[in-house]
């Protein structure tokens, strides 16, 4: 079965899977928000915990602060993201109580990015 077009410009995974909640090989539609984060945990089954940093301006102090947000995202077997991977996640329908996002692309490793500094 070929990977279907999910509506955004991402590279489809080479490996096929039989997960019904995969946006490429199943029938999970994606819509809404899309952002990049780092995988901090992959212990739950078919789930990864993503950490995302946001820089917010504090008007009173005329400074910026760094805020972090963690959220759970579905990890299809064809993408198979691991701890330390930089991934793109996209919003989808609620898959479980805490999961309403799905990993659509692996962008690299955090070690490779930090090694260039």
UniProtKB/Swiss-Prot annotation:
One of its GO terms (biological process) is translation. It comes from the Archaea. GO terms for cellular component: cytosolic small ribosomal subunit. Part of the 30S ribosomal subunit. This is Small ribosomal subunit protein uS17. One of the primary rRNA binding proteins, it binds specifically to the 5'-end of 16S ribosomal RNA. Keywords: Ribonucleoprotein, Ribosomal protein, RNA-binding, rRNA-binding. One of its GO terms (molecular function) is rRNA binding. HAMAP family: Ribosomal_uS17_A. Gene3D superfamilies: 2.40.50.1000. Belongs to the universal ribosomal protein uS17 family. The keyword Translocase does not apply. Signal peptide: none annotated. InterPro entries: NA-bd_OB-fold, Ribosomal_uS17, Ribosomal_uS17_arc/euk, Ribosomal_uS17_archaeal, Ribosomal_uS17_CS. Pfam families: Ribosomal_S17.
